[in-house]
A protein has these predicted regions:
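Nucleotide-sugar donor-binding catalytic core of glycosyltransferases
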Residues: 2-64, 71, 79-85, 104-107, ...
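Short catalytic-loop micro-motif centered on adjacent basic/acidic residues
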Residues: 75, 96-97, 163-165, 312
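Active-site proximal beta-strand in glycosyltransferases
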Residues: 75-81, 87-102
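Active-site donor-binding loop signature of nucleotide-sugar glycosyltransferases
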Residues: 99, 144, 167, 283-285
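Pocket-edge positions in alpha/beta enzyme catalytic cores
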Residues: 208, 246, 281, 313-314
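A charged, aromatic-enriched C-terminal amphipathic alpha-helix characteristic of glycosyltransferases
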Residues: 284-287, 294-331
Length: 332
């Protein structure tokens, strides 16, 4: 079984975290020669009407699919989280890829996707729980990735010593500041948000930076060491994720820009399976952090490290994920 298209929401979603999804869609579409089709979420606009809610109720679904037409070949659709309401994007001939699925969202997977031929989830902890609790549900693990075009051929010039960005563990941020205060010659920068816009911070000064993914990747290319962490590793994040700590695309992004990495992350099945320890040094105390950062600052990122990162990224390209999707569908 093949796919007929990829349903994209890029015309109705503009949040920065969707940008990597568009890259995945483009890479899969190019590799499998599939068209990108704009999502039409509901019958009369971008919000669900009473008719939509009736038409896409599970008990009415078989009739709505008959009325709306059904293709023999399924389409692919990315979801940041499991959807809350039924729509065109949850029909049985749409194969979902759910990127973030936290513990308190698990129940929505069987509710929304019970009639799918295959369901892909990018969080191994969630997949294992769903397989145990819903053994008849066609759940499959699909790790996050980067397109093959992001594999580096050379090492970029570096002028930032330590970079923190995204949802970094607060201990890492504190340790970064402490290290910079103890070593004034070190250039420590971090990317946060101000009034919803990405902001670059350095020595108490903030500068607005572009919200494009290209702007972020350019900063990564300039960074020697990137601080990494997984969701769910401190109290606030634990509450948000229910303790789930998946591998995020940030590890792949920093690997693509030839950065050393120091991080706080679990030694769970997903991190071991993807061999994150090969590219990111795990620390648990400031003493370990200090020694590791100090060592990496004087360790040149050379050809051995470049070769290692190339191998890591080749094993985790979006194109390989596309092959995995087709392989699963052919067996479904």
């Amino acid at each position: 079984m093949n796919l007929r298209s990829i349903i994209t929401a890029r015309h109705i979603q503009n949040a920065p975290f969707w940008q990597i999804v568009w890259e995945w869609e483009d890479a899969i579409a190019s590799y499998l020669r599939l068209p990108l089709v704009k999502q039409q979420p509901y019958l009369f606009g971008s919000k669900a009407t009473k008719l939509d809610r009736l038409l896409f109720r599970p008990c009415v679904f078989p009739y709505s699919e008959f009325l709306l037409g059904q293709s023999d070949l399924p389409a692919l659709r990315f979801h940041i989280n499991p959807p809350w309401v039924h729509g065109y994007h949850t029909r049985s001939n749409v194969v979902p890829i759910v990127i973030d699925c936290w513990r308190n969202e698990l129940h929505r997977i069987p509710v929304m996707f019970r009639r799918q031929k295959a369901i892909f989830v990018c969080n191994l902890e969630a997949v294992n729980i769903l397989k145990a609790s819903e053994p008849l549900l066609p759940i499959h693990y699909l790790p996050v990735s980067l397109p093959e075009s992001d594999i580096p051929n050379e090492i970029p010039q570096k002028d930032i010593d330590i970079l923190s960005y995204g949802r970094t563990h607060p201990d890492l941020v504190q340790w970064g500041h402490q290290f910079a205060s103890e070593h004034p010659e070190v250039r420590f920068c971090w990317i946060g948000t101000h009034e919803g816009r990405p902001v670059w911070y350095e020595k108490g000064q903030k500068t607005e930076m572009g919200s494009s993914r290209q702007a972020l990747m350019q900063v990564l290319a300039r960074s020697r060491i990137v601080l990494q962490s997984s969701p769910g590793m401190h109290a606030q994040e634990f509450e948000r994720t229910g303790g789930f700590s998946p591998v995020t695309p940030r590890f792949f992004e920093a690997a693509a820009k030839c950065c050393h990495m120091v991080g706080i992350y679990p030694e769970n099945d997903e991190f071991r399976r993807l061999r994150i320890a090969d590219i990111c040094q795990r620390v648990t105390t400031y003493s370990e952090f200090h020694d590791e950062v100090k060592r990496l600052l004087i360790t040149r990122f050379g050809t051995n490290e470049l070769t290692r990162n190339q191998a890591f990224l080749r094993a985790n390209t979006t194109e390989r994920r596309a092959e995995d999707i087709i392989r699963v569908l052919q067996l479904s």
